[in-house]
Amino acid sequence: MASYYEILDVPRSASPDDIKKAYRKKALQWHPDKNPDNKEFAEKKFKEVAEAYEVLSDKHKREIYDRYGREGLTGAGSGPSRSETGGAGPGFTFTFRSPEEVFREFFGSGDPFSELFDDLGVFSELQNQGPRLTGPFFTFSSSFPANSDFSSSSFSFSPGAGAFRSVSTSTTFVQGRRITTRRIMENGQERVEVEEDGQLKSVSINGVPDDLALGLELSRREQQPSVAPGLGVMQVRPTSLSRPPDHDLSEDEDLQLAMAYSLSEMEAAGQKPAGGRGAQQRQHGQPKAQHRDLDVGGTHKSVRGEAAKLSPSSEEKASRCHIL
């Protein structure tokens, strides 16, 4: 069993007010009615919290506990002397009350959940200025600095349905490193995630390190799309588009010019495009290489302009007609 200070999550130097605040928080957290899905475990924790509060809230019991431990209260071990127990004898032991009795005595007949607001000083003025949240379903959250560290908490209750969820986040700075601890309490199960400088280091379930849960959480975070800081958009790297080789482009241009030249010859000779002027050109030794020597500006010159430049003169037309 953990020490009473660890159960209430307070230091050994905690004041009586700190003990009360810690019990109020833990008692509401582990109340069996708030943990119907894990009632057996919640009852155990609820009992430990009540026992720790009953001892640490009593000055005399706390002194004996600090000196002898729990054995000094139950009669096990050496135990306190007669003077320390008020002359009750060496066999004297303290009798712990039921956790339900401690809970009723602490909260009284009022709404126990309304007491949770007392833990958050930032809400004290709000409670006096407006109506309190007393409905069956309500949620609230807080965020406040604690010395040089930071912490935030959020709680949600549904008393009728027995649903309870709390999330608390605390950040501390140790030797220049930022340690963030996130505690999630839901249906009697406590999940603790510890991050160091933004990197998840451990995940614990009900106080037990869980490597499987750690691996699943790391995998889930890695699958999330990366977002450019300050931009809010996904980072996309441009991909280079492949272009056709230059010689392929020049061959296409040569082919277009050759076709234009053949058409111009046909029009000049008064023939239809279906004629075989192209074949006659090759028979008269008209080399195709002539077209490649042309200084063509790619797509910046029109095909018709080139065809006009290449149209034969009247003398050439007459000689060709004579040959035909």
From Swiss-Prot:
The modification N-acetylalanine is found at A2. The modification Phosphoserine is found at S311. Residues 322-324 form a propeptide. SUPFAM superfamilies: Chaperone J-domain (SSF46565). One of its GO terms (cellular component) is nucleus. Ubiquitinated by STUB1; does not lead to proteasomal degradation. InterPro entries: DnaJ_domain (IPR001623), DnaJ_domain_CS (IPR018253), DNJB2/6-like (IPR043183), J_dom_sf (IPR036869), UIM_dom (IPR003903). A motif (CAAX motif) lies at residues 321-324. The J domain is sufficient to interact with HSP70 (HSPA1A or HSPA1B) and activate its ATPase activity. The J domain is also required for the HSP70-mediated and ubiquitin-dependent proteasomal degradation of proteins like ATXN3. The J domain is required to reduce PRKN cytoplasmic aggregation. Interacts with HSP70 (HSPA1A or HSPA1B). Interacts with HSPA8/Hsc70. Interacts with PSMA3 and most probably with the whole proteasomal complex. Functions as a co-chaperone, regulating the substrate binding and activating the ATPase activity of chaperones of the HSP70/heat shock protein 70 family. In parallel, also contributes to the ubiquitin-dependent proteasomal degradation of misfolded proteins. Thereby, may regulate the aggregation and promote the functional recovery of misfolded proteins like HTT, MC4R, PRKN, RHO and SOD1 and be crucial for many biological processes. Isoform 1 which is localized to the endoplasmic reticulum membranes may specifically function in ER-associated protein degradation of misfolded proteins. This is DnaJ homolog subfamily B member 2.
